[in-house]
Amino acid sequence: MTDFFRITNDSVHIEIKAFPNSPKNEFTGVRENRLCVRIAAPPEDGKANACLCGFLAKTLGCAKRDVVLVKGEKSRLKTVAVPVEYVEKLRGITGDI
């Protein structure tokens, strides 16, 4: 179940499939080695990306500035980086889905 992220020297890169315009922010599972995340914001003017980063920060208990969109600014397939110290909380997410 942890195939959706990889650990580098100082960060964890999370592979995400985002579903904007959803009724609420929530994790829906892991499919095709990506963490599936429903996002309540629309995919316009970076609103969904900001909402996704904020949701991840809140869930992991880190600052919003620690969640960085690495790839996929205009795509549903995204890569997000968080500091490596949050890897255990990230593993816990999959146990809750």
State the predicted function of each range:
Residues 1-53, 62, 68-69, 78-97:
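Contiguous, often N-terminal, cationic amphipathic patches that form binding interfaces
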Residues 59:
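C-terminal catalytic core of tyrosine-transesterase DNA break-rejoin enzymes
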